[in-house]
């Protein structure tokens, strides 16, 4: 469990057993969630799916709704994580964002898209956080 004593909204919990039973990707997504919470993001949802698309993390930060894509690479033999955000992937993410803001009556000026790239270096996570990414 990760929580911040000063902010009850900064809380995300999974048991150690559930973490160990999840696939590798979930481990890195959880690391991204912890990373965001340490920066005072309030996590709203993860793995938000509609037909034809998914957003890894949805959060609130500074009165904005933030949509976050997370990419992980164990090594760089397949390229850096930032290169994996293709036009098709961006199009699918945009479709999900449009659906979400329509469903939840959120203004376009109150949203932002971010990207978290995680690489494993000496068994530790190296995290690059890109804000205001253009879709």
Task: Give the residues covered by each predicted segment.
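Mid-chain, well-packed structural core segment of small domains
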Residues: 77-106
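An acidic/histidine-cluster motif and surrounding catalytic segment
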Residues: 1-4
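A short acidic/basic microdomain associated with nuclease active sites
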Residues: 38-51
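A cross-taxon signal for low-complexity, glycine/charged-rich
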Residues: 17-20
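Conserved catalytic cores of phosphodiester-cleaving nucleases, focusing on short active-site segments
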Residues: 36, 57-77, 87, 93
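Domain-level recognition of nuclease-like catalytic cores that cleave nucleotide substrates
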Residues: 102-135
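Structural motif
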Residues: 52, 65-67, 110, 127
């Amino acid at each position: 469990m990760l929580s911040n004593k000063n902010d009850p909204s900064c809380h995300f919990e999974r048991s150690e057993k559930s973490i160990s039973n999840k696939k590798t990707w979930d481990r890195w997504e959880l690391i991204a969630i912890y990373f965001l919470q340490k920066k005072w993001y309030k996590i709203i949802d993860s793995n938000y799916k509609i037909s034809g698309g998914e957003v890894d993390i949805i959060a609130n930060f500074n009165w904005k709704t933030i949509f976050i894509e997370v990419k992980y690479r164990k090594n760089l033999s397949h390229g850096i994580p930032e290169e994996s955000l293709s036009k098709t992937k961006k199009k699918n993410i945009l479709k999900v964002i449009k659906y979400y803001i329509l469903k939840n009556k959120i203004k376009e000026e109150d949203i932002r898209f971010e990207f978290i790239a995680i690489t494993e270096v000496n068994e530790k996570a190296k995290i690059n956080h890109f804000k205001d990414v253009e879709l």
